[in-house]
Amino acid sequence: MSGKRLMVMAGGTGGHVFPGLAVAHHLMAQGWQVRWLGTADRMEADLVPKHGIDIEFIRISGLRGKGIKALLAAPLRIFNAWRQARAIMKAWQPDVVLGMGGYVSGPGGLAAWSCGIPVVLHEQNGIAGLTNKWLAKIATKVMQAFPGAFPDAEVVGNPVRTDVLALPLPSVRLSGRDGPTRVLAIGGSQGARVLNQTMPQVAARLGDSISLWHQVGKGALDEVNADYTRVNQSQHRVSEFIDDMASAYAWADVVVCRSGALTVSEVAAAGLPAIFVPFQHKDRQQYWNALPLEQAGAAVIYEQPQFTADAVAATLAGWDRPTLLAMAEKARAVAIPDATERVAAEVSKAAR
């Protein structure tokens, strides 16, 4: 058993927190002690303790889009957060820290480095976040999920949930399927409106040639159901939230969704063709996440202005079952199913 200590620094969104939890659990099973560094007002504050991991808090928030007053106060806020993080590091003395992104990683990584603790970074997105960009200069090891975020970093993929990794391969799952094309439309919390507005119109154009399962997000169920009914397509399944996403992937022939880092990695691991609609962000992060799957012939990217019912219906109508199977196999070939083990191995190597 290891007995070594890891501090995971991650917060703000599920895209940072869930991969961190996967690596933490993997190392805890090998006897590591793990603690978490986060902020008290973001999702990690509730989520991490539910996973049996103690969490320490520092006070820090993002600087993007803040007024001049906030920017002038930033150096003092960062210094105070660094001081809090340094006190936590000195008290617990981890053998290594793992930065998975979010504002907390900045002061946390600097504090670890100033204490002589090795800093390991993992970038989940196809374009590096601001915090990871400057922490990379002091890190012992930098890893990336997709090629291109850093010029020389090792590509290790994103840790993906075990129930998704356990799905049968596309050749097993999709062979012998017939009937309407099963389309899984995943509107999440971030900008699901465009999918919710467009997919009923797609259904109207394709009729009985597709079977839709549409996750619409919180509070949108009645409105979207009414839209399907209005175009005489009420036979489709509309859910506010899908709890068992692995089962939904297993059911689907093709997925229509945003291209957040974890979604793209899950779609690849599941082995599914995709139509990706990147969230419109100024650094085009989601576009770069989806690009490797499009380049592999496993997906099509529609920027939001091009994501029209006519375009999506034409694309889906052009994919027969042999095409869908070939695309599914290409998606699975791009996946890195042992990402959790790869990240954990680098953490072990870097530990002092």
Swiss-Prot record:
GO terms for molecular function: UDP-N-acetyl-D-glucosamine:N-acetylmuramoyl-L-alanyl-D-glutamyl-meso-2,6-diaminopimelyl-D-alanyl-D-alanine-diphosphoundecaprenol 4-beta-N-acetylglucosaminlytransferase activity; undecaprenyldiphospho-muramoylpentapeptide beta-N-acetylglucosaminyltransferase activity. UDP-N-acetyl-alpha-D-glucosamine binds at residues 13-15, 125, 161, 189, 242, 261-266, 286. InterPro entries: GlcNAc_MurG (IPR006009), Glyco_trans_28_C (IPR007235), GlycoTrans_28_N (IPR004276). It catalyses: di-trans,octa-cis-undecaprenyl diphospho-N-acetyl-alpha-D-muramoyl-L-alanyl-D-glutamyl-meso-2,6-diaminopimeloyl-D-alanyl-D-alanine + UDP-N-acetyl-alpha-D-glucosamine = di-trans,octa-cis-undecaprenyl diphospho-[N-acetyl-alpha-D-glucosaminyl-(1->4)]-N-acetyl-alpha-D-muramoyl-L-alanyl-D-glutamyl-meso-2,6-diaminopimeloyl-D-alanyl-D-alanine + UDP + H(+). It is an enzyme of class 2 (transferase). It comes from the Bacteria. Keywords: Cell cycle, Cell division, Cell inner membrane, Cell membrane, Cell shape, Cell wall biogenesis/degradation, Glycosyltransferase, Membrane, Peptidoglycan synthesis, Transferase. One of its GO terms (biological process) is carbohydrate metabolic process. Its main location: membrane. Transmembrane segments: none annotated. It is a peripheral membrane protein. Its EC number is 2.4.1.227. GO terms for cellular component: plasma membrane. It is found in: Cell inner membrane. The keyword Methyltransferase does not apply. Pathway: Cell wall biogenesis; peptidoglycan biosynthesis. SUPFAM superfamilies: UDP-Glycosyltransferase/glycogen phosphorylase. Belongs to the glycosyltransferase 28 family. MurG subfamily. Cell wall formation. Catalyzes the transfer of a GlcNAc subunit on undecaprenyl-pyrophosphoryl-MurNAc-pentapeptide (lipid intermediate I) to form undecaprenyl-pyrophosphoryl-MurNAc-(pentapeptide)GlcNAc (lipid intermediate II). This is UDP-N-acetylglucosamine--N-acetylmuramyl-(pentapeptide) pyrophosphoryl-undecaprenol N-acetylglucosamine transferase. The lineage of its organism: Bacteria, Pseudomonadati, Pseudomonadota, Gammaproteobacteria, Enterobacterales.
